[in-house]
Structures are given as C-alpha cells and as structure tokens.
C-alpha cells in the first residue's frame, strides 16, 4: 500500500509549471471571536486569500453566536470536529461544559450549519480532517501520557492512522498543538494548532501546569505549493 500511495502523490499536486498556491488553515476556534478576528487580519496582511477550517468552531466560554455568524458569512470549506458534533448529537443535560454553556446562544440556523460539516474534505489536492481520517476525537501525531501531557507518536503509529489516503499534504487539528510530521514516503501531516484555545491552566494535575502550547497566542498554518512541492509554515 505504501508504494501505491507514494506513486499517487505526484498526481495530486498542482500540475501547472511554476504553479504557486497558498492556503491558510485554521482550527479549534472554540467560539473565541477576538482570536478569530486577529487571525483573519493576519492572514489578510500576508496576502493569503484561501482559508480552510478544520473544525471545533463554537464550543467554549467566549462568543459562540458571533463566531458562528462571522464564519457563516465567510463560507469556508470546513470539516466537523468532535465539539461541533457534540452541540447537536445529544441532549443539553448530557453535554459537557464546553457545549452546555453556549448551546442556548445558538439559533437553529447555527445548528443546521454545524450539521452540514462533513467529517473529511479534499481541497486542491489536500486532505482535511479534524483529528484523524476515521475519528473526530482521536489524537493523531501524539498521545496522552501521564497527567494528560502529550507525547509524540512514532512514525509507524502515525502512518497506521493514514489508511489509503494518498494526498501529499494532510491537515488536522484537535490537540491544539502545532506540529508538522513528514512520513518516509514523502507525505506530510500538519497539525495547525488552535486559534481560540491554545493553552489553559489545568489544576486537576499535581503539580498544575499549562496544557497545550503553554502560550496564549493564537496559532494557525499557511501551506504553499511551489513548483509542485508543498511547504508548511506554522504561524
């Protein structure tokens, strides 16, 4: 399967000689409208005109309704995250705090919009998913170790979750931790990090520590195809 997948990589790259494509990838906004606006402004400043969204757009203690309105107006290619699904596949009484404190601020149009997200997408030869191709709530590039700390997976474990996907570049989110991994066959998997919830202080652990990136800065990625080769910049 690996040889067949590698053979197909070139077929999925832009074929025009000298073709240059730039795409911004955002993920895990979690209703943080201020962070979203800051990231959109930075993307515009860099001259990138195409944006894809990797899910988990509204759940969180910020402004879910305004975030939904802005994203709906942008009409970005968007895949479903586990927190998007959690806003419509269970009763409010069974929701976690991520969802229960925002669901009443959402309209039926907002919920219908969330329901419209596919689990995966292919855009310009790129493969998009929230977490892994098969699951919207599984860590791909790492796993949770003691005290919930993230530990990098080895390459065979990363590749095992790829299945038969032959895209040269795969974009994901979910863990809020930016990372880029190149597989032995040349495929690259990029976790964009989180726009809206890049870090939080977890007092459940002993000693307590800051999860995810350890920084309050919003994160996203810009990917570029230059002369048939994809490059990723974690911003």
Question: Over which residues does each language-model region extend?
Answer:
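Active-site environment of divalent metal-dependent phosphoester hydrolases
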Residues: 30-35, 59-62, 84-89, 134-136, ...
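Acidic, His/Gly-rich catalytic cores of divalent-metal-dependent hydrolytic chemistry
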Residues: 18, 182-235
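N-terminal amphipathic/basic-hydrophobic helices that include classical n-h-c signal peptides
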Residues: 1-20
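Metallo-beta-lactamase
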Residues: 50, 137, 143-148, 191-204
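Active-site-proximal beta-strand elements of phosphoester/diester hydrolases
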Residues: 22-30, 125-132, 189-192
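Core catalytic region of metal-dependent phosphoesterases/phosphodiesterases
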Residues: 14, 22-115
